[in-house]
């Protein structure tokens, strides 16, 4: 149980408490109506917190294939993988093993997700260059460290503007 003055569990805190390197690389190519992209990004924790723990490093990779069918209407298939290391150390002010959320062994894991999407790019009028998109995903593989909720499905809706 949490009371006033207690620190929140690790993932509910507003930051990592460390300096982090954020490397990444993106590749995009287009041939007529077909677009292919791949991206890898990471979070590398460069130090520990003054409290005595360090969030795990992260690697996120995604690749997708998109096709524009006609006049701005397109669809896409995407594969996304996430790897998150477990926490190193612990915060001694938390009762680490009494609560699932404060146990440092219950963080991190591997997830692979498959996603499919639809989009429409407006080409004329006052909403030209606006894009709406909807994407649905399901987990293909999940291996969580410790006790964690698993992902069942994801939905993403967006509205963006290009200039």
Please describe what each predicted stretch is.
Residues 55-163:
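Outer membrane beta-barrel transmembrane domains
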């Amino acid at each position: 149980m949490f009371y006033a003055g207690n620190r929140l569990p690790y993932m509910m805190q507003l930051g990592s408490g460390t300096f982090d390197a954020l490397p990444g690389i993106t590749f995009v190519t287009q041939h007529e109506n077909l677009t292919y992209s791949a991206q890898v990004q990471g979070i590398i924790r460069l130090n520990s917190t003054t409290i005595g723990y360090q969030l795990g490093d992260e690697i996120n990779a995604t690749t997708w294939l998109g096709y524009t069918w006609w006049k701005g209407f397109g669809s896409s298939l995407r594969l996304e993988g996430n790897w998150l290391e477990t926490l190193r150390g612990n915060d001694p002010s938390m009762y680490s093993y009494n609560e699932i959320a404060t146990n440092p062994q219950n963080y991190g894991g591997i997830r692979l997700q498959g996603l499919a999407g639809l989009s429409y790019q407006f080409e004329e009028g006052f909403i030209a260059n606006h894009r709406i998109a909807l994407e649905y995903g399901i987990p293909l593989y999940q291996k969580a460290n410790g006790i964690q909720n698993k992902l069942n499905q994801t939905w993403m809706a967006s509205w963006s503007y290009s200039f």
